[in-house]
């Protein structure tokens, strides 16, 4: 573990509190609602989605609105690129101000140290930069020393998804491609995550390490069945590598990943995860057949089954740390009802879920292009709608979310018929929602229906959780 940095103050300044300050516990098993604010640095433009949403200008106002709902737990970003402007030189002024706003409202944050590609510009080669590992550990140590009251933390948001998009799919910097590119980034990043986790365990032993990543499920028929088998192995490799879980090189994806120079990945020291955060969207489930790949899957097993798989595999406390739906407010109401219903089913089956997070609380920007375009284009996914002026607007979804956060069961939420394009994307869900009493959306939010044709193929077998 690295030694304490000489650059750190001897005691916390305005942003910190005495180390003996009592930590708020994370929520118990149940349906506690958790909020979240989106902060991702656009890879090409150097613009932060948090700024485009206007949150930086109205932190207090956003937190007051959230506090009015009774929701105290939230995922909250710390912006490395706005803290360490040069190697080893930290400017805490902005972060101290925001942390004080959280403390003043008795909020319980899960701080997000790095959200996707949100690292400083001086790391010119991003995750592949030879300075990245030491820099991440230095930054993580500095945060832990300055804010010893923090109750929970995420070191890197969605490490598998982030490094897969940056290292395998060439969508984000450093634009590597293929299994060789992914292997390169994992060798660069995972050792530093292990070291940073050890650092936090030493400095803040009572803080909870919340590991957050995509919660996927892959199924298929015919030639697609083998692809699904590989993808189902792939979804687990990053967490397995840092926890030492099932590292059998006969596994279809793990074996390829840890060959040809990747053997060191099997020898990483392990880190401890206290809570496993599941990010589940309609596109988290994929289906493969003769025609290719389909996401969202036309044969989804559902959130309850997917959460059960992760519970069985890792034996950890779980949280639903992200879900949303890009669509009209009425579409989001129905997706909230669906995911909350599935969450309640999982709880009834004994899945240890500790929180339900619709993410983000305010519309984000430019995710319709996976951040390839930085146009400030509002992404209609939030609890509060982002309008061109930067203000927030309440919608029918805002009211539904607030009712659910106050304890309203999923069955008592409205069931609005999905509108285009959500009706096409979510057609595979409809058999599992036959018990709903559907309602037409208000005329002001109606759009023409679009016919959908599902791919041919037999329904894939579901795992045991889907039948419990």
Give residue ranges: language-model regions.
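N-terminal carbohydrate-binding accessory modules
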Residues: 2-69
